[in-house]
């Protein structure tokens, strides 16, 4: 099963997270299938590759709680509903 979750990057006390599609059996820093965005909690910046996120969601990937909240703010789920109604 594939999950969309955060992968920690950056240095000590300056964490930056990548949003990645990764197998659930892999550890947090394990090999990812694809990088689909990033989240910087210090500067409060996010970048999401919306087509890539939609691709993995349509294939059955489950986002973690934090990634779900980030995606909701980016209105990814509205685009998912629009694609499903077509």
Swiss-Prot record:
Q: Which Gene3D superfamilies match?
A: 3.30.1320.10
Could you give one GO CC term from the UniProt record?
mitochondrion
GO MF annotation list: structural constituent of ribosome
| Record localization | Plastid, Chloroplast
Q: What is its main location?
A: plastid
Q: Which superkingdom heads the taxonomic lineage of this protein's source?
A: Eukaryota
| PROSITE patterns from the UniProt entry | RIBOSOMAL_S16 (PS00732)
The alphabetical list of record keywords is: Chloroplast, Plastid, Ribonucleoprotein, Ribosomal protein
Pfam families in the cross-refs: Ribosomal_S16
Question: In this UniProt entry, which cysteines form S-S bonds?
Answer: none
User: Mind telling me what this protein is named?
Assistant: Small ribosomal subunit protein bS16c
Q: Which organism is it from?
A: Liriodendron tulipifera (Tuliptree)
